[in-house]
Amino acid sequence: MGRFIFVSFGLLVVFLSLSGAKGNNCPQDWLPMNGLCYKIFDELKAWKDAEMFCRKYKPGCHLASFHLYGESPEIAEYISDYHKGQSEVWIGLWDKKKDFSWEWTDRSCTDYLSWDKNQPDHYQNKEFCVELVSDTGYRLWNDQVCESKNAFLCQCKF
């Protein structure tokens, strides 16, 4: 009987340690999702400066890219919980060629888009970088002048 209890307790410890792991190596205050970690930074930066900040934070980091509709609600909730300001939030999508051919800075496939109504519009032929719109609960996107200053969302693999 004592051996049974000892083995059962040992299996319980192993199970609890494995169930808590989930392959999540994200630091505190980062959102783990689909094998990546996401963090909102409230410091206001131009789009290129935000991308450079993410890259310098850790090799392989970039402004965030999204590939599934299902990611939007979780990201939006995380930003609403942790973003201290009211600004829009830069993500890693941009129109490098200025011809409505949108690309992610991490060079991943542009297979999902979530534009706000009447967007993108390249307003006055000046908007080539993409932000999450605060008025939509950070669920929809707008193209914006890249030199505008926004908070930003980095994604990293730890």
UniProtKB/Swiss-Prot annotation:
Gene3D superfamilies: Mannose-Binding Protein A, subunit A. Belongs to the true venom lectin family. One of its GO terms (molecular function) is metal ion binding. It is found in: Secreted. A motif (Galactose-binding) lies at residues 119-121. Coiled coil: none annotated. One of its GO terms (cellular component) is extracellular region. Residues 1-23 form the signal peptide. Ca(2+) binds at residues 119, 121, 127, 142-143. PROSITE patterns: C_TYPE_LECTIN_1, C_TYPE_LECTIN_2. Its main location: secreted. It holds the Pfam family Lectin_C. Keywords: Calcium, Disulfide bond, Hemagglutinin, Lectin, Metal-binding, Secreted, Signal. SUPFAM superfamilies: C-type lectin-like (SSF56436). It comes from Bothrops insularis (Golden lancehead). It comes from the Eukaryota. InterPro entries: C-type_lectin-like (IPR001304), C-type_lectin-like/link_sf (IPR016186), C-type_lectin/snaclec_domain (IPR050111), C-type_lectin_CS (IPR018378), CTDL_fold (IPR016187). Residues 33-155 form the C-type lectin domain. This is C-type lectin BiL. The keyword Heme does not apply. SMART domains: CLECT. Disulfide bonds join 26-37, 54-154, 61-156, 129-146. Expressed by the venom gland. Homodimer; disulfide-linked.
